[in-house]
Amino acid sequence: MTKPLQTGMTIPVFPLPTTVFYPGTPLPLHIFEPRYRQMTSDALEGGRRIGMVLLKPNWEENYFGKPQLYSVGCVGNIEKEIKHHDGKYNFTLMGLRRFRIVSEKEGKLYRQAEIELLEEKNEQDIIEGHQNECREKLIENFREFIGYIPQGNPQKKEPSWDLGNKLSEFVDRFAYQLDLSLEQKQNFLEEQDDLKRAKFLHSFLKMKIELIHLSKMHSTQDPRWN
């Protein structure tokens, strides 16, 4: 029986240089390094959980050692795993919870950490048939943004808005679809306050809209859409 996630437990940690992972979102992974094949094998025999964390800048200098990590990551559950004849794996990691690394543990080829689970703050229910101000404002912002994108551009696509029954779920899955920078993604992950995360996404979309307005002031045709 799989133990429930809890503060104080030790989980495998998989650091990557360009990936920030959110609760409620899927992350397809191809595992080929021997140490991470072992990590996957151990996880499948145990709780099927892996913690994703972002490597700090200059990780290249010590990639096969222990490059520095950001302290906040997201733990996910292994789904749809395939083990290939050469020992490599493909699977999808489904995000579960934000966590903070308390301390790293020795004893494995791969990195492990004792974690503290991070609680959501200012959580709100999203009830079908009832408006949620944060949700509606973000949808309005997004529709305004894609309204400026010419027909035929692949970015002019409205997603499904069925992104969860909690505000935390909605903003995390909404952020997953936006072209945030790596730094913005990590800052968003580290923010536990759901309302502050919603406010950040609102500001991000408003900034994108303002950039389009400024561009149109200088040119009748926005070169970013060429």
Where are these regions (language model features)?
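N-terminal low-complexity, acidic/polar interaction/targeting segments
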Residues: 1-226
